[in-house]
From Swiss-Prot:
Record-given protein name: N-myc proto-oncogene protein
Subcellular location: Nucleus
Species lineage: Eukaryota, Metazoa, Chordata, Craniata, Vertebrata
Chain residue ranges for the region called Interaction with AURKA: 19-47
Subunit structure: Efficient DNA binding requires dimerization with another bHLH protein. Binds DNA as a heterodimer with MAX. Interacts with KDM5A, KDM5B and HUWE1. Interacts with MYCNOS. Interacts with AURKA; interaction is phospho-independent and triggers AURKA activation; AURKA competes with FBXW7 for binding to unphosphorylated MYCN but not for binding to unphosphorylated MYCN. Interacts with FBXW7; FBXW7 competes with AURKA for binding to unphosphorylated MYCN but not for binding to phosphorylated MYCN.
Region (Interaction with AURKA and FBXW7): 61-90
SUPFAM superfamilies the record matches: HLH, helix-loop-helix DNA-binding domain
A cellular-component GO term for this protein: nucleus
Domain bHLH: 377-429
GO molecular function: DNA binding; DNA-binding transcription factor activity; protein dimerization activity
Summary of the function given for this chain in its UniProt record: Positively regulates the transcription of MYCNOS in neuroblastoma cells.
Species the sequence originates in: Marmota monax
Note on domains (UniProt): The 9aaTAD motif is a transactivation domain present in a large number of yeast and animal transcription factors.
Residue spans of biased composition, Gly residues class: 159-169
SMART domains the record matches: HLH
Length: 460
């Protein structure tokens, strides 16, 4: 199996056929022995170092070198820029070895065009099966029998009815087969605007639209080649529309590319799909696929582009109320009027509360002005209660001062003096009370003695 040419830049071009067409090339390869160019004394590191620095390719894996050797132009743009001019367009000897020398004249190679948009887990198997069937058609005997099992498996919808044609039909259908997938795939010039075609395209024989035999052969042979990126068969027992195959085989300007995630949704639809209908169905079934469009390009018909623009505008208009619902800066329509809280304030001013009244609970402020008014009202009530408490305390001190004999005439007595004199006066009153209690006891004892004397005098 020949490997990549490493004449110009040996350190940059891969030598592993399985990792050649990966979009993310590993920095180091285990099979490279001449990576270090320091000299004969330099020794490569061990296997653990290679495993540490190896960058694993991301899935899906690229096709093997055995199935893309006949490719006239590489699919990876970085590899294309690094390849030399001689190796960029393939080796004619290798193409002749496979019996596909005619592929060199086709600028849009169907294998690369179909392989440039891998999608799904079975893309590699479909590509290998398509290339193997091409090789069988190219090497087949003159008396070709019924269709091969691979072709039957790739065409369960009955598109392989052209496989029963004779050797002449197979030989005539081979160039059309190789040119047919290019019409169904995306042109690289649309995706990559830089000029990459180095050769002039060879003239491709076009089958007339009026011959049903040749059209059937083209339709049957083109089905396995387009299985890599085209949609799967619509219904198992329903044959495909022959007119659509004729239009696709004779028109090189129309392109069609359907992704694998749309295959399940488009099983009951025809091959030509209205974009507006697809948008309505996708928007109703999956609410997240708002900006996802079905890739159906018809340059001759400009009505589909207008329909796509109108559908996208409709979808964007549907999303507008959702953004408006989450606009927290907008004023809420459920805010009550600001006339109710001032009525409570007027009520509190008209009927003042008593001394130990409970302050009404604070209402939810709807504006800064209402919050300021409530704060001032609360401060005013607090001042009133504090003033009443101070007046009561002052009147109590004045009453206490009036009861102290030393401070009756002193109107400017301080509160501390009033408290001290009142304490001394209380202590003096308590001492006087104690003396009076002792005198009372003496008097009661004297009374008892006198009563006894009176009784003795009466008995005598």
């Amino acid at each position: 199996m020949p490997s990549c040419t490493a004449s110009t830049m040996p350190g940059m071009i891969c030598k592993n056929p399985d990792l050649e067409f990966d979009s993310l090339q590993p920095c180091f390869y285990p099979d490279e022995d001449d990576f270090y160019f320091g000299g004969p004394d330099s020794t490569p590191p061990g296997e653990d170092i290679w495993k540490k620095f190896e960058l694993l390719p991301t899935p899906p894996l690229s096709p093997s070198r055995a199935f893309s050797e006949q490719s006239p132009e590489p699919s990876d743009w970085a590899t294309e820029m690094l390849l030399p001019e001689a190796d960029l367009w393939g080796n004619p000897a290798e193409e002749d070895a496979f019996g596909l020398g005619g592929l060199g004249g086709l600028t849009p190679n169907p294998v690369i065009l179909q392989d440039c948009m891998w999608s799904g887990f079975s893309a590699r198997e479909k590509l290998e099966r398509a290339v193997s069937e091409k090789l069988q058609h190219g090497r087949g005997p003159p008396a070709a029998g019924p269709a091969t099992p691979g072709a039957g498996a790739a065409n369960p919808a009955g598109r392989g009815h052209g496989g029963t044609a004779g050797a002449g039909r197979a030989g005539a259908a081979l160039p059309a087969e190789l040119a047919h997938p290019a019409a169904e795939c995306v042109d690289p010039a649309v995706v990559f605007p830089f000029p990459v075609n180095k050769r002039d395209p060879a003239p491709v024989p076009v089958a007339p639209a009026g011959s049903p035999a040749v059209g059937a052969a083209v339709a049957g042979a083109a089905a396995p080649a387009s299985a890599a990126v085209a949609a799967p068969p619509r219904l198992g027992g329903r044959p495909a529309n022959g007119g659509d195959h004729k239009a696709l085989s004779t028109s090189g300007e129309d392109t069609l590319s359907d992704s694998d995630d749309e295959d399940d949704e488009e099983e009951d639809e025809e091959e030509e799909i209205d974009v507006v209908t697809v948008e309505k169905r996708r928007s109703s079934s999956n609410s997240k696929a708002v900006t996802t469009f079905t890739i159906t390009v018809r340059p001759k018909n400009a009505a589909l582009g207008l329909g796509r623009a109108q559908s996208s505008e409709l979808i964007l208009k549907r999303c507008v109320p959702i953004h408006q619902q989450h606009n927290y800066a907008a004023p809420s329509p459920y805010v009550e009027s600001e006339d109710a809280p001032p009525q409570k304030k007027i009520k509190s001013e008209v009927s003042p509360r008593p001394l130990k009244s409970v302050i009404p609970p604070k209402a939810k402020s709807l504006s800064p002005r209402n919050s300021d008014s409530e704060d001032s009202e609360r401060r005013r009530n607090h001042n009133i209660l504090e003033r009443q408490r101070r007046n009561d305390l002052r009147s109590s001190f004045l009453t206490l001062r009036d009861h102290v004999p030393e401070l009756v005439k002193n109107e400017k007595a301080a509160k501390v003096v009033i408290l001290k004199k009142a304490t001394e006066y209380v202590h003096s009153l308590q001492a006087e009370e104690h003396q009076l209690l002792l005198e009372k006891e003496k008097l009661q004892a004297r009374q008892q003695q006198l009563l006894k004397k009176i009784e003795l005098a009466r008995t005598c």
